[in-house]
Amino acid sequence: QIAQGEIFGIIGRSGAGKSTLLRLFNRLENADSGEITIHGEHTRHYSRSQLRDLRRRVAMIFQHFNLMATKTVAQNVELPLKMAGVPRAERQKRVDEILALVGLSALRDSWPAKLSGGQKQRTGIARALVTQPEILLCDEATSALDPENTHAVLKLLKEINQRLGLTIVLITHEMDVIRTLCDRVAVLEHGEIIEQGEVWRVFGHPGHAVTRSLLGTLHHDRAEERLSLSENQQLVTLHFDGSSGQEPDLQRIAALLGADARLLYGSCEQIQGRVIGQLRIRLAKPLANPHLQQHAGWVADRLTLSGDTAAENAGA
């Protein structure tokens, strides 16, 4: 269930069914079973006229823009209104408003061939918004863009969501898009949702192996650090999954682990205002497990030790 006004992300491996699921929302694909409801309305048995209205209310943008090369920016944006029979004066007024919203007023008479990738996607967004939809579907909308244009398009989508109260549903292979933009995320595998929740929860403590594989760098394991330990050394991993809201405090960590602690590596970032990641620390002398576990909550959300396989698997 996707709430009105939220930004909802869908991730999964290639072939998981992400694009098919997205296209079910506006009935570009037909469901073999089950039901999809939009604002409480079942859409499975819609007539042609009802489908036209549905696709006006549920707009879509694509990875490859799909602009008409022989029409200007303004003409591309105007096209859905023209096809719907909207009067010319009303069309022009609406196009002017939308071009101003997406920052393309100065390029209204430009041809698609003269636009950058980011400008083309902004045109696609404007064309989708011109019918005043309630929901915007984004099918890999930033995959063809460079990092700078990706950031600009994500910022625009966030502004549109906040200003218009628009519900946005997106699919992507880019975890940074989910981190930056989404309120909640679902993980799809073989056409089934295997995990979903707030972004910080799913990224901070993924419960499924597929999710951990997709997140990759946030939940890696480096066996070579274990192999490099001498007989008397100990490896401590501090996990931050966002559940307590605390941040790494080096002073507290040093107080708990002692002066003979060395930071091997760490990876932490903020997602929805919560710190997600881990720190791995080598101790010159091992500390008693009960002592560390008793005080673990003082410095991290979880703590695991080298060789503590059961604890590490439970926390993975």
Please annotate each region the language model reported.
Residues 130-134:
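A short, proline-enriched helix->beta-strand linker immediately N-terminal to the Walker B motif
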Residues 43-59, 83, 88, 202-206:
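ABC ATPase NBD coupling module
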Residues 111-115, 119-121:
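Conserved ABC ATPase signature
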